[in-house]
């Protein structure tokens, strides 16, 4: 049986969960070449038993992703339509549930035992393992311990701070992708009623680049495919995505596609286990057999080389079309539905294949094989995630990906399309509900008509802009609706200093995290219900809704007893805060919203495009799919009225002499900033997180050996002639299969290396996949 390296137990004296470990004791074994299997089942059950006990584990997992159950608080991969399997979850989904539904609690007594300074010295993993937050807490100026506060007093404190600001724009309101549609709608309504569009959210740090690129290309920032499209594609390209860890249920769909004859191309710097082979634990060959091979072609690309890859593929496709006109380019689609083809053709035929080889690190023969697979496919889906979105040229890269699909007419046809795979379970739904600093006029006008308010029109702060504003003293109140802002964001030292400049920080949270310890002069922790928790108002069970990565909207029903009677739902927190902030005469019916979420959904139906008759449609089994004009009717709501070919100068990430290009990534025991454990089973790491994966040739070149400990020092030219350096200390060197000149390490440990101002053009997403670093021996 799989055994964790960490030692955790509950202290008899303090009742704290010790969660002790020693980073120096980390061990490294060969990487795995298959994902899931029986071991994934064993780990799922082990984590459930540790956190929830047998009965609660059985009750929770039986309802996870079921039609009458709750949506997984992990990733945004969709449920398959129709009947559900008995176990409709993956290993990391089970871990997410175990973390949220744990029987451990963090009470007021816990905060009495531990000062903020003491807790600040604990690692993120230790903090999370203490359990669910059970009481609202306040830290006042001069105090060194959080102390209990009543809910009414907490609301009044926030309202007084907000109403005392000289401008609503001196407050920012952050959102995590866990927040439900109902809570997100109410939250943005509160914020716009207050008078600002300062609505940064977690999407700013991940798929903002996808939204920007797709909006330019096809007129909508969402993917165009369904589960059925993926299952019936001829060819699936998976670029910059690690489904085995980040979206494991996707592997089942890929398995079905393979059974239907699909070919799969994986494009990634690391040979991740889930890209190589999948052992489905619900099938015989996944238990006693060898499972299913995933990638027919593995393209081990250099970091930042994806734009060059797809530009090179575009050139080969265009050259094949010129040799045999009508054989490659879908002329009917391009002529009738696209703009900018001639400019794209001229630019792409000038792309040098030698340059493509240098930028990608692959051989011409492999590029030709991939091009041949694209030409042979009549139904192509291209999927991607952070490996494409977190580069300076991310928007241009995704435009290049879309160009290849447009050439072949692969938008708005069955079995084909774009598939940005979202990370957090409702991050796409939050945007649909209005969580964005620059919502379009159509949405704002509808909001104003429905509620009789006047929404501000000036764009607000995204995540990076919000940090800059706090840093510069232009924002003095920060409120986080979920998430772990201090650990999720770049440039840790700058971000933490920015938060500490605030007069008030408010965190609406399920569990203890670093953001509770990096605080303003006054700080509040407001404990909230999670997806798994039963939400009852006036004796009536409340339901919430979420939107997955493929625009399917469905209900989620928590069923477990909450951790305490002092925990409130996000909707209730928002609505009661609004009552304290605006008083009883406000035109928005906050009390009615707090008591009956159906009334919120009625308001959503009146405001949000595609959500008409929301209360009825969301109650249909499997829910409903939001409109997507390119998918539904080959209608492109762009500036040209057509799908636009993107034409950009070719960009990639050269490796400076004596340096490496570092990407930050998750371990298999991690979901965003939530650390489930200290092992990365697929990559062979056990018992620690401060490791850096480096090609053996680079290890030799730098005069190192595997097992050495080094500091990572990032170097960034700030555009004003200055060279900025940042340091992350004490990483174990691990020899690994990664392109020469490239390296990888886990976040949030490496977030201190990411400059706040090094962001993607157009999307302003931090560049976390192309950090220039040098290695120095740890002192």
Curated annotation (Swiss-Prot):
Keyword Oxidoreductase annotated: yes
InterPro entries: Asp_de-COase-like_dom_sf, MopB_CT_YdeP, MoPterin_dinucl-bd_dom, Mopterin_OxRdtase, Mopterin_OxRdtse_a_bac, Prok_molybdopt-oxidoreductase, YdeP_MopB
The keyword Transcription is assigned to this record: no
The protein's required cofactors: [4Fe-4S] cluster; Mo-bis(molybdopterin guanine dinucleotide)
GO cellular component: membrane; plasma membrane
Cofactor note: Binds 1 [4Fe-4S] cluster. Binds 1 molybdenum-bis(molybdopterin guanine dinucleotide) (Mo-bis-MGD) cofactor per subunit.
Annotated binding of [4Fe-4S] cluster, by residue: 72, 75
Bridged cysteine pairs (disulfide): none
Gene3D superfamilies named among the record's database cross-references: 3.40.50.740, Dimethylsulfoxide Reductase, domain 2
EC number(s) recorded for this UniProt protein: 1.-.-.-
Keywords from the UniProt entry: 4Fe-4S, Iron, Iron-sulfur, Metal-binding, Molybdenum, Oxidoreductase
Other comment: Was identified as a high-confidence drug target.
Entry similarity comment: Belongs to the prokaryotic molybdopterin-containing oxidoreductase family.
PANTHER family: PROTEIN YDEP (PTHR43105:SF4), RESPIRATORY NITRATE REDUCTASE (PTHR43105)
Protein's UniProt name: Uncharacterized oxidoreductase Rv2900c
Organism, as annotated: Mycobacterium tuberculosis (strain ATCC 25618 / H37Rv)
């Amino acid at each position: 049986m799989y055994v964790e390296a960490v030692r955790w137990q509950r202290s008899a004296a303090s009742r704290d969960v010790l969660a002790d470990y020693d980073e120096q004791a980390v061990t490294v074994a060969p990487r795995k070449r298959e994902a899931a299997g029986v071991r994934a089942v064993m780990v799922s059950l082990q984590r459930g038993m540790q956190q929830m006990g047998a009965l609660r584990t059985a009750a929770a997992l039986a309802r996870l992703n079921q039609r009458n159950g709750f949506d997984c608080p992990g990733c945004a991969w969709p449920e398959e339509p129709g009947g559900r399997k008995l176990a409709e979850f993956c290993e990391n989904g089970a871990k997410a549930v175990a973390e949220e539904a744990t029987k451990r609690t963090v009470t007021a007594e816990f905060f009495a035992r531990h000062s903020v300074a003491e807790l600040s010295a604990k690692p993120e993993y230790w903090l999370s393992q203490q359990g669910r937050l059970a009481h609202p807490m306040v830290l006042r100026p001069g105090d060194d311990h959080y102390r209990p506060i009543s809910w009414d007093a907490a609301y009044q404190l926030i309202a007084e701070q907000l109403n005392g600001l000289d401008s609503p724009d001196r407050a920012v309101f952050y959102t995590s992708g866990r927040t439900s549609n109902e809570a997100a709608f109410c939250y943005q309504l509160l914020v716009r009623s207050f008078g600002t569009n300062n609505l940064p959210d977690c999407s700013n740090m991940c798929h903002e680049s996808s939204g920007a690129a797709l909006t330019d290309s096809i007129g909508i920032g969402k993917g165009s495919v369904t589960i059925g499209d993926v299952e019936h594609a001829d060819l699936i390209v998976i670029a910059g995505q690690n489904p085995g860890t980040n979206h494991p249920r996707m592997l089942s769909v890929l398995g079905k596609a393979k059974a239907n004859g699909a070919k799969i191309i994986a494009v990634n710097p690391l040979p991740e286990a889930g890209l190589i082979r999948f052992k489905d634990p619900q099938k015989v060959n996944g238990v006693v057999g060898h499972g299913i091979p995933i990638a027919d072609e593995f393209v081990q690309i250099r970091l930042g080389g994806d734009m060059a890859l797809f530009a090179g593929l575009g050139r080969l496709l265009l050259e094949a079309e010129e040799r045999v006109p009508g054989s490659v380019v879908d002329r009917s689609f391009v002529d009738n539905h696209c703009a900018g083809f001639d400019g794209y053709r001229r630019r792409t035929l000038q792309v040098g294949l030698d340059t493509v080889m240098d930028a990608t690190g692959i051989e011409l023969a492999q590029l030709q094989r991939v091009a041949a697979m694209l030409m042979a496919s009549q139904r192509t889906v291209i999927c991607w995630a952070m490996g494409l979105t977190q580069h300076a040229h991310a928007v241009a890269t995704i435009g290049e990906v879309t160009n290849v699909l447009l050439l072949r007419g692969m938008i708005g046809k069955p079995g084909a399309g774009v598939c940005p795979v979202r990370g957090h379970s409702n991050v796409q739904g939050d945007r649909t509900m209005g969580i964005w600093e620059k919502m379009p006029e159509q949405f704002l006008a509808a909001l104003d008509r429905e509620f009789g308010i006047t929404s501000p029109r000036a764009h607000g702060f995204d995540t990076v802009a919000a940090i800059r504003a706090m840093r510069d003293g232009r924002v003095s109140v920060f409120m986080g609706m979920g998430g772990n802002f201090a650990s999720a964001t770049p440039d840790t030292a700058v971000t933490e200093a920015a938060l500490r400049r605030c007069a008030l920080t408010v965190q609406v949270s399920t569990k203890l995290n670093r953001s509770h310890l990096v605080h303003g002069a006054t700080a509040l922790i407001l404990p909230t219900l999670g997806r798994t928790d039963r939400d009852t108002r006036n004796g009536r069970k409340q339901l919430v809704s979420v939107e997955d990565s493929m625009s399917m909207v469905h209900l989620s029903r928590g069923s477990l007893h909450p951790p305490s009677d002092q925990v409130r739902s996000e909707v209730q927190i928002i609505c009661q805060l609004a009552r304290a902030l605006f008083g009883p005469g406000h035109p928005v019916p906050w009390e009615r919203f707090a008591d009956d979420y159906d009334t919120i959904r009625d308001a959503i139906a009146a405001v949000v495009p595609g959500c008409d008759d929301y209360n009825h449609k969301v109650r249909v089994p499997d829910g409903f799919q939001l409109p997507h004009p390119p998918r539904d009717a080959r209608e492109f709501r762009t500036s040209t009225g057509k799908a636009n070919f993107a034409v950009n100068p070719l960009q990639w990430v050269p490796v400076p002499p004596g340096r490496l290009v570092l990407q930050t990534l998750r371990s298999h025991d991690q979901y965003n900033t939530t650390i489930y454990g200290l092992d990365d089973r697929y990559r062979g790491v056990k018992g620690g997180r401060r490791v850096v994966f480096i090609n053996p040739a680079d290890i030799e070149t730098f005069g190192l050996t595997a097992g050495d400990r080094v500091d990572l020092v990032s170097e960034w030219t700030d555009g004003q002639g200055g060279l900025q350096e940042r340091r992350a200390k004490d990483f174990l060197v691990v020899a690994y299969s990664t392109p020469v000149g490239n390296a990888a390490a886990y976040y949030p440990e490496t977030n201190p290396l990411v400059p706040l101002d090094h962001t993607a053009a157009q999307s302003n997403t931090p560049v976390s996949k192309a950090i220039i670093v040098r290695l120095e021996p740890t002192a």
